[in-house]
């Protein structure tokens, strides 16, 4: 996997190829939310486009996966590569706010996300869905997406659905809540490492 293109630009390019998926991603943390996403899973494209737009992170992502089997490998591996790219683009994390949280409504649904970019991978997910599949996307993969992302981003991510019935609304609210929480956490608020340890 590549290193950040330039520390000051907070960008990264990462690729990963296995017998199940072939993924490449370019991102810029300090972008405007422009995106070109082709994951092979249409509903995931929609969620990642929302993430890019609301986090204001520029993303170009392509994935060729074994979706003839199911969506599991593509969704999981995209999360792993996205987490790696986000981590690399953060560099030494000097000056970042580190913590972020958001609460986002979408009609009857209400999602909350809180996260810590302090280097400790952990994921807590509290949400249930009325449908098992949305347009080829297995709803059980929402939790697995954020678990996989937390591992390679080295982040602590807590996600909860507080209200809601419609499965699409709940999932979209989750991705948007994560977007705003991450946007908050990666924002520059100082010059040093935000930890008494001196490293995160």
Swiss-Prot record:
The keyword 4Fe-4S does not apply. It is found in: Cytoplasm. GO terms for biological process: L-histidine biosynthetic process. Signal peptide: none annotated. One of its GO terms (cellular component) is cytoplasm. GO terms for molecular function: imidazoleglycerol-phosphate dehydratase activity. Gene3D superfamilies: Imidazole glycerol phosphate dehydratase, domain 1. The keyword Lyase applies. Its main location: cytoplasm. It comes from the Bacteria. Keywords: Amino-acid biosynthesis, Cytoplasm, Histidine biosynthesis, Lyase. Its EC number is 4.2.1.19. Pathway: Amino-acid biosynthesis; L-histidine biosynthesis; L-histidine from 5-phospho-alpha-D-ribose 1-diphosphate: step 6/9. Belongs to the imidazoleglycerol-phosphate dehydratase family. NCBIfam families: PRK00951.2-1 (NF002111), PRK00951.2-4 (NF002114). This is Imidazoleglycerol-phosphate dehydratase. It comes from Prosthecochloris aestuarii (strain DSM 271 / SK 413).
């Amino acid at each position: 996997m590549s290193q950040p293109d330039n520390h000051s630009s907070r960008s990264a390019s990462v690729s990963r190829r296995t017998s199940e998926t072939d993924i490449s991603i370019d991102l810029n943390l300090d972008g405007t939310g422009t995106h070109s996403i082709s994951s092979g899973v249409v509903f995931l494209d929609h969620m990642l486009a929302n993430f890019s737009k609301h986090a204001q992170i520029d993303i170009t992502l392509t994935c060729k996966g074994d979706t003839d089997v199911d969506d599991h490998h593509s969704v999981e591996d995209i999360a792993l590569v996205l987490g790696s790219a986000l981590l690399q683009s953060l560099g030494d994390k000097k000056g970042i706010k580190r913590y972020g949280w958001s609460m986002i409504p979408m009609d009857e649904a209400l999602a909350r996300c809180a996260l810590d970019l302090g280097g400790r991978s952990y994921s807590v997910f509290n949400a249930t869905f009325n449908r098992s599949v949305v347009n080829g996307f297995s709803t059980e993969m929402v939790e697995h997406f954020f678990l996989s992302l937390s591992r390679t981003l080295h982040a602590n991510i807590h996600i909860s659905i507080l209200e809601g019935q419609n499965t699409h609304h709940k999932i979209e609210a989750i991705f948007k809540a994560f977007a705003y929480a991450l946007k908050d956490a990666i924002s520059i608020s100082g010059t040093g490492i935000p930890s008494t340890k001196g490293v995160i």
